[in-house]
Amino acid sequence: MAIARRCAYKIHPMDITKISTGDNPPEEINVIIEVPVGGEPVKYEFDKESGALFVDRILHTPMRYPTNYGFIPHTLSPDGDALDAMVVARSPFVPGCVVRARPIAVLMIEDEAGGDEKILAVPVDTTFPYYNRVGERSDLPHIVMEQIEHFFTHYKDLEKEKWVRIGKWGDKDEAFRIVRESIERAKQSK
């Protein structure tokens, strides 16, 4: 017979409003992780109202995320969501954690909902110095960009009425511009 145990701790939803965009945006940003690198094909999303992490959907195409994936708080993309961010790291980060990161590029994507830019970033040097010499996407192995493009090209393949078109990669300056614009857009929407 199984004995029920009381949980010794409570999980409290995160108050996203108390997490800043970063110490020095756009050069240093905070990314709230929703999906870890190599994670199961489950798309999680934070609910802005409750601060809880919800399962958005199980990806129909059995693929694993090539980076840690999340969003930059207090930003707003043209699609109405927070600005997406991919954090390259050798280790998976737990969904719900906040990672301080440096943008190095941006991938322009269009899907059935419209434009959907994704910032490519690496952890700040004090978090993980492995990437301290990475200043642009060209400093990463080329296969990293190929894996990211392949993932986003195909991860919706088996979902009806969904599609993705990969656009161009923008450099660090373009990523900074998009971060700044998304911060301004979020401020204006309040």
Where do the protein language model's features map onto the residues?
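Hydrophobic N-terminal alpha-helices or hydrophobic patches in metabolic proteins across all domains
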Residues: I11-K190
